[in-house]
Design a protein with these regions (language model features):
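The conserved Walker
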Residues: 8-9
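Walker A/P-loop
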Residues: 14
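Residue-level preference for the first positions of well-ordered beta-strands
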Residues: 2-4, 27, 65-67
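NTP-dependent small-molecule kinase module
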Residues: 3, 19, 23, 83, ...
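ATP-dependent NMP and nucleoside kinases share a basic, alpha-helical "lid"
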Residues: 59-109
Length: 129
């Protein structure tokens, strides 16, 4: 099962993902860490698509339930995940170029509007058992 935690920069994606995977053996792939490993800080359209592909490929290679957290700005690429969590906690992100291209989701499994999300974490963890 592939779980996507997405939203604009600074919305709490990594914090949510870390809490979701705490005390488990579920791999957590963070976009900034993955970009650092590949030394790929290209945020052009091509670079963003390459990163989207890289993140889904990591889940495929892991061959088990995994969690990824990244902006994932395009609806087209969110459909590759079994569970989607939209971190919709603040009005806009830190980077105006990303704010402009970010497509509001057409469908999500969970929308997080504040930082009181323990119930949703428990619900997802129960789905994984």
């Amino acid at each position: 099962m592939k779980i996507l935690i997405f939203g604009l920069t600074g919305f709490g994606k990594t914090t949510f993902a870390k809490q979701l995977t705490a005390d488990t053996d579920i791999p957590h792939f963070n976009a900034d860490e993955i970009r650092g490993m590949f030394k790929d800080w290209d945020f052009s359209s091509t670079g963003r698509i390459r990163q989207v592909t890289r993140m889904i490929d990591l889940c495929t290679i892991a061959n088990k339930t995994c969690v990824v957290d990244f902006v994932c700005p395009y609806n087209l690429y969110r459909k590759d995940y079994d569970i989607t969590v939209w971190m919709n906690t603040i009005e806009s992100g830190r980077f105006e170029d990303t704010n402009k291209i970010f497509e509001k989701p057409t469908h999500v499994d969970y929308e997080i509007k504040d930082y009181n999300y323990d119930k949703i974490i428990k619900e997802i963890q129960n789905r994984l058992q």
